[in-house]
């Protein structure tokens, strides 16, 4: 039985007309276009207006990200040949292109028949489109704003040597902390932990990660010195001394992990270690540390799932 009112179809009408969709989901989708459970033309028009504003905001945020990139690229142009600078610019350009690729979905056709509020199936389809469009606009705003912030931080890093050195020192801190943790793990193998072979394999993999990160820091240290030389900025020599210490400690950890290895462990995990080595070989400075960590997580052995 139809529950159509002078204003339009009711939520119950739409639930009855649409098969295979949970009624609560339908009700939630229709909320923006209903008034007291009835679809109205005024509510639809208001929803279109609000959604259009969201879409305009999203495109504006993308334009601001484009402006931020262009400004940063102009500032970086004299030193863009330095890997630490050029690679960051390339990454931002790719991210900007990814954000710009969202623009077509920010331009949906939101026009509707004048009597759509009386058509239950079309009202539902329109409500789905609105939900998807609002979600796409929100995602685009978030992505564009995050990118703009990252680009502004890069520009500040580029223009302020202290910010560059502070960021490098923070990276050194992270690697030193990781070395501390790894040394403690190695000290507990093979007698102080359960599943020592798995602990050893994980430690061996983490050692490879630290070696890659130390090499990445060495490459960035060279780039920071070139930047300082070109801009006549003072250079923090103590950063190089700390990096020397990090490289020495990584070498010691590599030696220690090899010394405690049972030959059977090496044989058992040879393929896993080789697979990680192959993946890490594809990374070149400047390295995205998050991607390296994801590579490690993908290869770490799990004693709870492997046959023992």
Residue ranges and their predicted role:
Residues 1-146, 300, 304:
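Leu/Val/Ala/Ile-rich N-terminal alpha-helices, chiefly Sec-type signal peptides and the beginnings
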